Amino acid sequence: MTDPIIIAIDGHSSCGKSTMAKDLARAIGYIYVDTGAMYRAVTLYSIRRGLWKDGVLDTETLRDEMSDVRITFRLNAETGLPETYLNGENVEQDIRSMEVSAKVSPIATLDFVREAMVREQQAMGKSKGIVMDGRDIGTTVFPEAEMKIFVTALPHVRAQRRLDELRAKGDATTTFDDVLANIEERDRIDSTRAVSPLRQAEDALVLDNSHMTIPQQKAWLLERFQEVTGS
């Protein structure tokens, strides 16, 4: 049996990183960590605490209260997938709302938020054997990761995928244009922020999944894993 490694999967929003990371982790027996869910949980906390006034975040209050934000993952026995908990409450569905999606990128630009999240993520990966997806895993969190993937897809493809997810969850009001505008704005913020901007690591393998099925993506990732580990 080969020694466990760290697998970093980075890329744009709504390009299917979480789905492929979950599938890969399950197939190879690794732990999956959804770092995007961590930032979404902080965002949900800020919304529930009323820290947004007229679209502006009270960053100083959030900074003062970051020590009160506890994010954990627990395995759902029925689905076999990890779910996100905020201060002991299952918020897996709540963090996927459009309101959270609209505010998560500004939250993720805050240095004190990213520093806190990166510390947590690095602690989770100390023993290796993990698949972690996000925006800066291969560049900031684990620059030494043995396997790095950078995922991309056409904006309109990502928007349709995200809209399909929202419809499946009962959202009948959000439009395609709403989702596309949100994705394009998140791309802009993620790529231009001062702290840990979204960028492709020099040694990352690029996966454009615009026209790939989920099984095809899984097969591609498994092949790359076998090449890296020699298994």
UniProtKB/Swiss-Prot annotation:
Q: Which reaction does it catalyse?
A: CMP + ATP = CDP + ADP; dCMP + ATP = dCDP + ADP
| This protein's UniProt keywords | ATP-binding, Cytoplasm, Kinase, Nucleotide-binding, Transferase
* Single Gene Ontology MF annotation: CMP kinase activity
Q: Name one GO biological process term.
A: nucleobase-containing small molecule interconversion
Q: What is its EC number?
A: 2.7.4.25
Record-listed ATP binding positions: 11-19
Just give the chief location class: cytoplasm
Output the Gene Ontology cellular-component terms. cytosol
Where in the cell?
Answer: Cytoplasm
Note the superkingdom of the native organism: Bacteria
UniProt entry tagged with the keyword Kinase = yes
Q: Does the keyword Nucleotide-binding apply?
A: yes
Q: Where is the signal peptide?
A: none
Assigned protein family: Belongs to the cytidylate kinase family. Type 1 subfamily.
Record's protein name: Cytidylate kinase
- Source organism (scientific name): Porphyromonas gingivalis (strain ATCC 33277 / DSM 20709 / CIP 103683 / JCM 12257 / NCTC 11834 / 2561)
The encoding gene is cmk
